[in-house]
From Swiss-Prot:
Protein name as catalogued: Female-specific protein transformer
Domain notes: RS domain directs localization of proteins to the speckled subnuclear compartment and the purpose of this localization is to allow colocalization and co-concentration of components of the splicing and splicing regulatory machinery to permit relatively high rates and/or efficiencies of reaction and interaction.
Keywords, alphabetical: Differentiation, Nucleus, Sexual differentiation
Biased composition (Basic and acidic residues): 1-18, 25-40
Any single biological process term in GO: mRNA splicing, via spliceosome
Disordered: annotated segments: 1-117
Gene behind the chain: tra
Cellular compartments per GO CC: nuclear speck
Tagged with keyword Nucleus: yes
Organism: Drosophila erecta
Positions with biased composition (Basic residues): 59-73, 81-108
Domain of life: Eukaryota
Higher taxonomy: Eukaryota, Metazoa, Ecdysozoa, Arthropoda, Hexapoda
InterPro entries with a match to the protein in the record: Tra
């Protein structure tokens, strides 16, 4: 972390050079902070009844913020940082392939392509073509076609008389073939 004169993260560290580096307004307010804190603390119900333990607890709570622990940047920090950076990059390069694969798969679960199902519907040809077969269009040059299917002479609405009753040979027992 670079500490320039104007950087906000340097504000804690400025007092290492004595009160010279602090501005007048900051110095004036610094004396007042204890009063303000005491005013605030009066409103709060303490966790422990006895004051020593309460103060100890407050002090320990405040220590948890990372900046107050280390006032000055330590000498070894640069080498430490370099080492940490190297190890981090090594870990990233090792795990990158699996990470990319997981990231690609995560938005949607695996969707198979739609399966195309063919149903072969059996239609007698005279039904398929209509009664007169393929009708020719007169607007175009007529190609020599084979003669169309002869129209079916007659179709029984019910089962034709000479066939016996099928043993469930048609589609279903309850749906007679018409």
């Amino acid at each position: 972390m670079k500490m320039d004169a104007d950087s906000s993260c340097g504000a804690d560290h400025r007092d290492s050079h004595g009160s010279r580096s602090r501005s007048r307004r900051e110095r004036e307010q610094h004396g007042r902070t204890s009063n303000r804190d005491s005013k605030k603390k009066e409103h709060k119900v303490p966790y422990f009844a006895d004051e020593v333990r309460e103060q100890d607890r407050v002090r320990r709570l405040r220590k948890r913020s990372p900046r107050s622990t280390r006032r000055s940047a330590s000498r070894s920090q640069s080498s430490d940082r370099r080492h940490r950076h190297r190890s981090r990059s090594r870990n990233r390069s090792r795990s990158r392939s699996s990470e990319r694969r997981r990231r690609q798969r995560s938005p949607r679960r695996y969707n198979p392509p739609p399966k195309i199902i063919n149903y072969y519907l059996q239609v007698p040809p005279q039904d398929f073509y209509g009664m007169s077969g393929m009708q020719q269009r007169f607007g175009y040059q007529r190609l020599p076609h084979p003669p169309p299917f002869p129209p079916a002479p007659y179709r029984f609405r019910q089962r034709p008389p000479f066939l016996g009753a099928p043993r469930f040979g048609y589609r279903n027992a309850w749906r007679p073939p018409y």
